[in-house]
Amino acid sequence: MSSSSLRVLAIGNNPNILFYTSRFQLAKNIDLYHVNDSKSCQFEIETEYYGKDRFELENHFTSIEHLTEALSSKSSEAVFDIIIMSAPSLQELSSLASKLTSIIDSNTKIFLESSGFIQLEPFVKLSMESPHVNVFSILTDLDIRQIGPNHFKHFPSTAKENTIYLGESKSSTEKYSSGVITLLTTFEKLFAKLFSNIKINLCNFSSIEFLSQQWKLAISRICFDPLLIMFEQENPSDLDQQIIAKPLISGLVTEIITVAKTMGARLNSSHDNENSLLSLWKNSYHSTNKPPALVYHFIHQTTPLNIDILLLQTILLADDFGIKTPYLEFLYSVLSQFERLNSGKSKWFIRSDEKTQILQSLQKSQKNESALQTQITSLQGQISKLRQELLMQAKQHEMETNELKEKHQVALKAQAQAQAQAQSQAQTSIEALTPTEATNQSDTNEYKATGTPNLRDIEDMALYSVNYGDSPVRSPPPVVSSQPQMNSPLSSHSQTFGENNGTNDKLLQERELQLRKKELELQERELEFQKRALQQQRFNNSNNSIPRKPSFPQLQQSANVRSNSRGMHGTNGAMSQPASAGNFVDPISSSIAAYDPQQPPSLPLQQPQQSVQVQPFHSHSIKPTSRKNRNSNMPNIGNPSSINMSDFGRPPNNSSQTRLNSMPTHSIVNQNRLRSQQSKNKLNMPHATNPNNTFNQVPAPSLNNHVPTQRQFSSSTMIEVTNNNNKVNNSSSNPDISTNSVVHNAMQFTNTNNNTSSTVDINDPKNIAPPPTTSVSAPSTPTLSSSSQMANMASPSTDNGDNEEKNGGKKKRFGLFKKKNKSKK
């Protein structure tokens, strides 16, 4: 806008203010500002003359404070040329006038919206600090109402002139001053341009006529419109039917006419009596069938009622002239309370339309509830349907699960039957391959030179589910089964029944383990007796002294001997230490084993197939000879460290045998020495390759007879010694010995000390004495014998002396006595 533009400010919520604003915003040379409670700057108005107009105000503010703040931020002037204002109450009007001080000056022209109000100009001047400011009033008979938020409408009436009045209401003078007339003339031209088709009336530049026009517009609004609200009537023609309304109408009309005439207003005949006023008021709304603007705004609550300015200002004016107005005061009090009720501030009363709204809201909520209930019912039906489907699926799943379980059980039963059949076939094949021992063996063969008895009383127990490995010559054919082939029938039996047969298989496995333990103990005992017999024989061969009665101490077995004993079973591989006399205590047996020169010694270290219980063996009676040719039943120990496998073929000279007075069994290891891998089907002892092993040593080359000797210790152990190639070979002529039989073979030895090649057959009944009846007893604690200590302290020179005796062919003193003579010297 240029500096020549007219700055106009419109303030208030009165519908007439917006009507004026709608016309001013069309002018191009007017800088328009608007202030009201609406937060929106878009407005819409419908009039009979200008039609429907929708516009947006650029400079719209919600309060004077916001306006002054915005103006102060701009560099332009903050003073307005024209201000059109209204207020809902006298107090707010005074406050608004005081706030305008910063945006007005002496040239500012203020127009008060006074349609239906009386003489507000002096009240505004008193509130302003500038008493010389020109304050005018503007009023119109146009019925402009607010029908909605920021929406206004013109309600036409045939009884009205549709005129805008400009002027100043004063009761002291009749004519305006020349300056006021000039200003009013200028504004008349301005409004005439802006409000075309509407009359602009200056009331002949007379303040009395302008005051009279104010009263004409205000009498019906003061006397009749509030009574419609009080009696809850919308149609003006129904007010006179109320009996109580007639005295109120009479009293109010009388008081208003009195005050108007007292102030100098000139009322015509149509406005100076009660009947004419009431008739004119009814006719003004007869064609529209609409209530008056005050009643309309009260019902729709769209805009303030302005009760304070309408009634209280009249009461104050009457009081200024000393006129009593009890009806008017009563009406003001009642309408003030009704306005509080209408705004919802009452404690006891509410509007019926609020109840209607509540009922409508309740009905709407009920409809929503019914819709939601229907939806809930539908969802519940879906839920029940889904539950039924879920139950059907669960039943079907259960049936399928039961079918699968039955199929699985049938498969397990079939598998168990197949495994049991395979196991029975395997057991049958094993029993078919197991030879039985001849029952008609003579009693003389029950005790062999090896010291291993035939234990027939535990034969059945040993035959029950015991397997120590396949025979080195012949093995059973493989068993065809539906299950994967195992390494051995025993491991297949243990694994298959352990997985499928439950408690019965566990009991069977425990029984097998017990049998294995007992069998291993018997094997260890057998090997211990074999070692003792070997040591005794070697001791007798190395020492040709006078036989002496041995003291029978307990055999103290060391850890290395136990490991050698386990090596004989094939669990630990080859024997790691030589079986020398230094590893044992004093020999406890004086039995002499016969020899057979035709049977060479051999030692295939195989896994023993059957263990038997140790029993006393027969002693062989040989006639005593001279001291020189008599054989001692004591072991020939030239040097305890020189005891080796080369002395196994040396038989004693004395054929007489002495039985043990006591047989030590306390030192025999009874622990469970199970093999490290039970699933292996062969437990054969690998061939000993350790050069320190006693069984790998060959006999001394100084022996008179080089015929190899063979001694069978048990059905599964055979020692073969060759003098030519210094190694142990597996005999190719080994018999096919079953795992569950104990075979005793005759053992023959060649006499290496005598020149004669006579042999003694120990199987001859003439040379076998019956077994002694000596009771076997063992001391509670093992003790070391003197011969064991002597064997540990022997020097290597003994072996040298013995070798010299063999090489020279000259009979020399025994190494044992020679060592003692040297020590005496």
Swiss-Prot record:
Chain spans, region Disordered: 472-503, 538-664, 750-825
Keyword match Coiled coil: yes
Swiss-Prot/TrEMBL keywords: Coiled coil, Cytoplasm, Phosphoprotein
Listed InterPro entries: 6-PGluconate_DH-like_C_sf, 6PGD_dom2, KPA_reductase, KPR-Related
Compartment annotation: Cytoplasm; Bud; Bud neck; Cytoplasm, Cell cortex
Entry keyword annotation includes Phosphoprotein: yes
Compositionally skewed regions (Basic residues) per UniProt: 809-825
Coiled-coil stretches noted in the UniProt entry, renumbered to this chain: 366-423
Positions carrying Phosphoserine: 471, 551, 662, 757
UniProt biased composition (Polar residues): 490-503, 553-566, 631-645, 652-664, 789-798
Source domain of life: Eukaryota
Low complexity biased stretches: 480-489, 604-616, 750-759, 774-788
GO biological process terms, semicolon-separated: endocytosis
Sites of Phosphothreonine modification: 496, 739, 756
Broad class of where this protein is predominantly found: cytoplasm
Gene Ontology CC terms, in alphabetical order: cell cortex; cell periphery; cellular bud; cellular bud neck; cellular bud tip; cytoplasm
Gene3D superfamilies associated with the record: N-(1-d-carboxylethyl)-l-norvaline Dehydrogenase, domain 2
Note: Present with 2180 molecules/cell in log phase SD medium.
Family, per entry: Belongs to the PAM1/SVL3 family.
Function (record text): May have a vacuolar function.
This protein's name: Styryl dye vacuolar localization protein 3
Native source organism of the sequence: Saccharomyces cerevisiae (strain ATCC 204508 / S288c) (Baker's yeast)
The organism's taxonomic lineage, starting at the top: Eukaryota, Fungi, Dikarya, Ascomycota, Saccharomycotina
